């Protein structure tokens, strides 16, 4: 048992270093190509001329697509091995290391050039790769899946400052191949990864800063649960839109470089309307939570960002949809809150409350993981008093979503890739 805890600690440190490496690589690329040192792609887009804002995501997509296409052509005769941590957990716990690193580099290119895709996919993949590399050299084969799971949970904890949610991510989404008794090492890896991340960055323990002083009574809990119903319908619709968009890109029969370039070009076009479509949506989520905009502003940015996310994910841009889903959920919740604000007092507070609820419930509706989604929002914001209401709303959203559409976003992602 002590041996396992020691290995879990080592994997937590390795995962945090892998995530930190990806973050620093992003900052370097943003400085080299965008002259941006703020860490916000939205700020970078705002400071660019319109023509550069238009073509930068397309150039990044073209470069990433060429990298993936070239690697595929050079390795056509090699036997297939997993390049995704979910696939590795469902098989024999082994990765194609070269292909996985190329995929991560391609993700770095599209993310740093402004595509509306999450960087967490590559971060978690690199964390799982680091864990797998260590495990194959230092542990017996029958434990490899456990250590990959520890690496994935640690990567998520490091990326989102949410160790418990990272552990439950494994338990609720990926645990089909593991015993519940293995959750101990997973939690240790996640917590150690978060502590290492804090030591490396010295940043805020919370991912998002929220000022919410609204007292929770029957009315507020009713609004939270009703937001879960809204998200339970919107989640399957969002997944259907992603599938339909992806199939539309495939029907164009473009080579990967041009397919990803087209997705990036669409993001560039949308960024001419609002630079907020660039990136994974983190900075826009933070600004919305600090100062909720008017309903018309939220609606405009929401529509543009949704189209950008669909273009990026549909074109096959390597990355995650976790953070974009949080932004879309926030927007849905805030729109719902703003509409109720016409009749109820405390419009801004209600918008923030239902925005946070929208983040949790849309995540639950798309992942079918209500406990993970609830804990994630609480850990990212520190608003643990929302936990009871969020948990009920997330369960409602997850059950309704599963009734309308059996597949989660992760099963859908595995099937498409």
Swiss-Prot record:
It is found in: Cell inner membrane. One of its GO terms (cellular component) is chloride channel complex. It comes from the Bacteria. The chain crosses the membrane at residues 5-25, 54-74, 146-166, 168-188, 190-210, 222-242, 258-278, 288-308, 316-336, 339-359, 380-400. One of its GO terms (molecular function) is voltage-gated chloride channel activity. The keyword Transmembrane helix applies. InterPro entries: Cl-channel_core, Cl-channel_volt-gated_ClcB, ClC, ClC-type_chloride_channel. Keywords: Cell inner membrane, Cell membrane, Chloride, Chloride channel, Ion channel, Ion transport, Membrane, Transmembrane, Transmembrane helix, Transport, Voltage-gated channel. It is a multi-pass membrane protein. GO terms for biological process: response to acidic pH. Probably acts as an electrical shunt for an outwardly-directed proton pump that is linked to amino acid decarboxylation, as part of the extreme acid resistance (XAR) response. NCBIfam families: PRK01610.1. Belongs to the chloride channel (TC 2.A.49) family. ClcB subfamily. This is Voltage-gated ClC-type chloride channel ClcB. It comes from Citrobacter koseri (strain ATCC BAA-895 / CDC 4225-83 / SGSC4696). The lineage of its organism: Bacteria, Pseudomonadati, Pseudomonadota, Gammaproteobacteria, Enterobacterales. The gene is clcB.
